[in-house]
Amino acid sequence: MRQKIVAGNWKMNGQIQQVTELVSQIEKLIGFDCAAQVAVMPPSIYIPKVRDCLRTGKIVVGAQNVYPKDYGAYTGELSAPMLKDFDCRYVLVGHSERRQFFHEDENFVAQKFHHVKDHGMIPVLCVGETLSERENGKTEQVIAQQVLAVSAKGKDCFRDCVVAYEPVWAIGTGKTATPEQAQKIHQFIRDLVGEINDSDAKHLTLIYGGSVNENNAKALFSMPDIDGGLVGGASLNAKQFVEIVKCIN
């Protein structure tokens, strides 16, 4: 079901005191009726602590990564059943940093995507082009390849999931796509999914990630196919993050 979402990806930041203070501050500041589902995605070791700190029901917890097997000899990895034990609702798959630094290809991302869905959680499929791909006119080609990679399991594969458009050139750089640039790609993704399943395309939640902050969020979220944001650096500041959440109202 299409809904408004603002998710904070904390990446590899914070230790236990900082994480505890951050989630408590965010929850305290969200003392208003929020139009969006708010999620925080801490480093995996702190997921239980963050979950236990939540009191109001206005914030849910998510995970930044998952391994696509239920159990086994995969040293250092976490499975979807493990994440589900700690009430994770959302799981990122295909984030550009995983693709870049850990060489995760389309097939592996697709395995993660379906592993998360098979265990009743919501995968957040991250897609996006590099600066060179954009400059060479390959944006739509790259996005289509990344989106369609998960579609092999049938026409219902985009039901109950989120797609996050995160142009790689805008992540952590301070640069951001204009609202019009982001809208164009979000509409392209919705149309692409519509070729597989029109009903699921209409109900698909599409969010934007790429240097989202309190200054650009309102304009981005006003676009017809942008349903929220995947927030990086700004989510590490409680006040800034909540200001972004307010922009969805």
UniProtKB/Swiss-Prot annotation:
Name one process (GO BP) from the record. gluconeogenesis
- The reply on keyword tRNA processing is no
The record, for CDD domains, names: TIM
Q: Which InterPro entries match?
A: Aldolase_TIM, TIM_sf, TrioseP_Isoase_bac/euk, Triosephosphate_isomerase, Triosephosphate_isomerase_AS
Residues of the active site are 95, 166
Protein location: Cytoplasm
Q: Which domain of life is it from?
A: Bacteria
Q: What's the stated role of this polypeptide?
A: Involved in the gluconeogenesis. Catalyzes stereospecifically the conversion of dihydroxyacetone phosphate (DHAP) to D-glyceraldehyde-3-phosphate (G3P).
Similarity comment: Belongs to the triosephosphate isomerase family.
The identity of this protein, by name, is: Triosephosphate isomerase
Q: Which organism is it from?
A: Legionella pneumophila (strain Lens)
Q: Which gene encodes it?
A: tpiA
